[in-house]
Every structure is written in structure tokens, then in C-alpha cells.
Amino acid sequence: MDILSKKKFTEINSGKFGITKKIVRKIFKKSILNSTIKGKQLIHSFPINFYIDNKKITDKPIGQICEKFGISCFNLMVDRFCFEALDNCYKKKKISVKGFFDSGVASSISSLTNSEKNQGSVCIDIGSSSSKVVVYLKNKIVYVANIPIGGNDVTLDISKGLEISPESAELAKIIYGTLNLPFNEKIEIDLDSNEKKLISKNLLYGIIKPRYEEILEIIRDNLFDNLYARIGINSIVLTGGASKIFGLENLSEHIFNRKSRIGRIERPDSFFHNKPEFSTLLGLIELAKNYNKYDFATEYLNNKFLTIYDRVENWIEDSYA
């Protein structure tokens, strides 16, 4: 499902008695209601900055005195037809969906540290058919993209290059795949016919590395077209199933000219330790645990005013208590 990201600026008259939590609630609700686009469904709305009389930018508006009070939000939207079709699939099975979340945002929440989010980092989740890119700057999401290229493209290259099935190619990629030049040793690849194919490991390397270079270069070019992303990024965190290949950190540092690491759970006793393919799942768990914090836009747009009021209230209390 394609993601549309769009910044939205909203402004209200605040009077001359100082900004209160009530005014913050008012402007954020107005921002959500004014963010509707025909044919699109809003799934996330992240506050970026508050504006005092169109000049001063602040993260802490409570108590500030001004006549005009503004807010800029970073909104994520999806195609409404696809959204409703997916929602109806669950309803037919009598499954009630509490909320929809962007998988790239979920991966970034589980993979990035608070320090990385503050200093400026990008989380790149390389999946099977797409790569999800999320940029944080000063603890705020400033860029999101979903690029239709991923690990399956590598598998298909191997399948065509070695004239083997995609299943055998995927297995060869997992077992023998590397982005560092290997010794010119011979390896055996299991075929579907219970036979084996003997090839040079260098041949496999020669197929895999160019495709990974292309994937990262496409991501880099899309990323650096955005001024915030190009200037603010200090580090790269790679996650997703296709990030497990040996040597990806070094290749990423070469292409992005930024410090790179593979996203992982730091607890060695955890089942998810060194398993970046579970980053989206772990992020979704975190999102579900903090549902009030991350998702109130959808229910507000569906006219569930009491619920959204409570959620915005919780967000304001947590942020500006």
C-alpha cells in the first residue's frame, strides 16, 4: 500500500492570555480535521513544531503569550479504497481492527535508540518486496517513504543468473550470501530435484553485491532529495529480513557516508536478539502498548469524538504536564 506523506500547517487565534492545554487540544484537533484529502485515509499525524505569531518555533508552547498560535504536523496517508478493502476483509471474519500503523514507523520505534532519534537517524527496513525509510530529527519524524525494491529482487537475480528456482536461490542467498569479497571457493547449491549444483562463491557474490548496491543507492537518492533528511542524518540503522546479509553495514557506510549498524534487540537472552527481521512485529507491539500516544487521528476522522478527546488529552498530559 503506497504511503503519502504531507506536512500540514494549522493556525488559530489564541487571544492574549497565554497558551493553555485547552488551546493545544483545540489546534491539534483542527489540524486533524483539516488534513483530509479526497481518496486518502489519514493513519498517522505527528506534531513537529508549534509557532508563536508566525515567528517563534517552540516545543513547549504552554504559557506563551501570542495572538496567533500555529502547529505543523507530519501526516501519513494511504489510499482510502485499499484501506477500506483491507478493513472489510477483517470485518467479514468478524475481526475488529483497533488501528492501522505504518510498518516502517513500527520498525523505527523498535530499532532506533532515543539518542539516535534525537541526533538524526534514518531507519531503513529492507523487506522482501519493499524498503521502508523513516527519518527522525530531534525526536520527530520528518520523512517517510516506501520504495518498491527489496530482498526478493536479489533472489530473482540469483535465480536467473544461476538458472535455478527462486526457492533454491533464496536458500543460497541465506546460507552463502555475502557483500564482502569471499575466497574463490566452491559451494554446493541444493536444487529442487534433490540434486546439487556446484558453483564458485565469487559468482554468487558477483550477483548479490550489485543488486544490494542498487537498492541502497536508490534509497539514498530518494532520501537525499529531502533537505531535512540530507542535512539532519548522522547515522543509518538497517533492519528487516534482507539486512541480515554479511557485510551490509560496511556497504551502507560506503554509500551513505554515514555510520551504519544493524538494528537489534540488545538483550542477549531475548529470543529476538540479532533478529532484525522481527523489527516490525516488535514495533507494532510497542505501538499497541502505547496506543493512546501514537494513534488518535483515525478515530477522530471516524467521528468517535469522545475517544479521540481522551486520547488527545492523554497525549497533552504526557507531553506538557
Stretch-by-stretch model annotation:
Residues Y90, I158, I219, L238, ...:
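Residue-level signature of catalytic and energy-coupling elements of molecular machines
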Residues M1-S121, V142, S165-P166, G177-I208, ...:
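Nucleotide/phosphate-binding catalytic cleft detector across ATP-hydrolyzing
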Residues G177-N180, I231-I255:
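Glycine-rich phosphate-binding loops at beta-strand->alpha-helix junctions
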Residues M1, L112-V144, I158, L284:
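Gly/Thr-rich phosphate-binding beta-strand-loop-beta motif of the actin/hexokinase/Hsp70
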Residues I255-L282:
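Conserved phosphate-binding/catalytic loops in two-lobed NTP-binding clefts
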Residues P148-E170:
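A conserved active-site cap/scaffold subdomain adjacent to cofactor or substrate pockets
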Residues L216, R220-S235:
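Phosphate/pyrophosphate-binding loops at sites that engage ATP/ADP/AMP, CoA/4′-phosphopantetheine
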Residues E116, F224, L251-N257:
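Short, solvent-exposed amphipathic alpha-helical segments in soluble enzyme
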